Amino acid sequence: MMLQAQDNGAIKELVSRLDLESYKSIIKGLTQFGDRRQGTSRNQKAVDWIEQQLQAFGCSNTKRLAYTYDPEPRPPRRRQSASEPTDLTTPTGGNVGRNGSGPGGSSIFGYRSQTGVNRDLMAQPDERIRELNREEPTNGPRTEVYCTKIGTTRPHEMYILGAHMDGHGVNEAVNDNASGTALVMELARILNSSDVETEISIRFALWNNEETGLNGAYSYVRQRKELQGIENPPGSGEYPEPTWLGMIQHDMMLWDHGAPGPDGKVSRDQRREADINIEFQSNSYFAEASMKLAFRFKAAADAYNTDFPATVGPHMTNTDSTPFMNEVPSISLRENERGA
């Protein structure tokens, strides 16, 4: 089967091969490594496991990108005294908690509540999960894995499908971000089937060190962007880094809880208006092209998705497509919007 643009029959066939049980199985496999926090042996074991799975799916040309994570120590944060008054007003005159500025240039409407990640091992009530995550991270060498479906007619060009495989928080990092990692791996399974060909190359990249500041994705961009479109060895027809046509990130895909209620609590149930949010960054060099890419994904979701509508927003931020957004059209798929 040759997958070409506008070939609705081939697309429908590939969509039908998406398998919920396969997706859940990959997520379950990732949870055996706890939160997969960077700088730990559980993280490195997860990278090894991901590579083995990609090879088993037929994406056998796996590669590792190596880099070093050794940041300067952060200065201690000044803690606000309980007696100091807190300014909760926003530029519109309302109080924080009702309205205010949000990430990626967004505005927040409705109620807000404080969020954060648990770093206290003993705050995790499950003893098994505590033991999985007992090892603390250390700075030093890191690796992340990717593989490539080689295009038949345009092997020198590619789209990058990415997700970060690391997490943190003394948990199993299921939503953030086994959910995105498993989706990219499920796509790798389908698109690397022996009966599937694509005109353009597709790279499946599982980033590391997202939770520490997108370090794995930034390292990829720094190391690989100047290699785009170069045939190596000359005359071989091989392109170790095909020219980037677009970058599509998958980060937190599992459930849409919506905004907190008046009591500041977030519902444990998915909201009735749950959707897929496709984001680009309006303050990026490729904003217009990224917006067009986002709406192409929305059109595809409208045509082939069976459960959830898709919406497009301009506030992409804090995810691994950010390092790419001034190099190539880039979008992020996620469970909920950054803000209005």
Describe each PLM feature range.
Residues G9-L18, T31-R42, R130-E136, D166-A178, ...:
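Second-shell loop/turn segments in exported
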Residues V145-C147, L161-Y218:
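Alpha-helical metal-binding/catalytic segments enriched in His/Glu/Asp
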Residues W207-D320, S330:
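Metal-dependent peptidase/peptidase-like ectodomains
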Residues V15-S22, I27, T31-Q38, I50, ...:
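Sec/Tat-exported extracytoplasmic proteins
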Residues G9-E13, S22-S25, G29, K45-Q53, ...:
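Extracytoplasmic/secreted proteins, especially bacterial periplasmic and envelope-associated proteins
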Residues S25-T148:
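A non-catalytic alpha/beta surface segment that caps or lines the substrate-entry region
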Residues D35-Q38, S60-N61, T68-P71, T152-R154, ...:
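Solvent-exposed loop/turn segments at secondary-structure junctions
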Residues Y23-T31, N61-L65, E144-T148, M158-G162, ...:
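Structural recognition of the beta-strand scaffold that forms the well-ordered cores
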